[in-house]
Amino acid sequence: MKLEIKPLTPGLAEDFFDFFDNRAFADNSPMQPCFCCRPQMTKEQEEVELFGLIKENPGVMPRDIPSFKSTLRKIAEQQILAGYLQGYLAYEDGVSIGWCNANDKENYSTLGIGEEIRNVYKDSPNERIKSVLCFEIAPNYRGKGVATALLIQVCEDAKIKGFDAIEGYPQLRAQRETFLHRSGSAVRKSRVH
């Protein structure tokens, strides 16, 4: 398999949405719908735009609320254009097959789940940390090294851009979760050499 890894830019937004709309959750994953935009949302935006829809539809899974996916997509579009949503797309034969949300940790300090992340591991005040929050790989490509290739690119770019360390937050769970359900996390931190 010949992979190409590209950083997300507004020019690649169509590939990003094509991946999440058509391949990311082809296995009917309970994680859908998702456009990986929640970590970049403010708590207020999350409360009004997402939890408001959930509260209006008690007992209904978010993926079954008709306007939930379109709301997430609109938020992701805005975040991509503004540069808040950052990460990498993996391609095979010009088709997007994987995604990794990776950003400067400081960008999460006042956004979305940022405070939770910052409280997991206290940094030295002068360190630049690249945070890796999420991977999503098309079902037919899982277990074939796509996430590894994405992570290698994150690490290479972090080194070039002068980051001091890379942090990840692997989920400790036996199975995939539904949207908004939380489980324990562990932190892995690696120095950039």
Predicted regions and their residues:
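A short, internal acetyl-CoA/4′-phosphopantetheine-binding micro-motif in the GNAT/acyltransferase core
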Residues: 117-120, 135-142, 172
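Conserved GNAT acetyl-CoA-binding A-motif
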Residues: 129-132, 158-178
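Short, solvent-exposed beta-strand-terminating loops
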Residues: 21-37, 100-111, 157-158
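Conserved N-terminal entry element of GNAT/NAT acetyltransferase domains
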Residues: 1-58
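Conserved acetyl-CoA-binding loop-helix of GNAT-fold acetyltransferases
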Residues: 132-137, 143-159
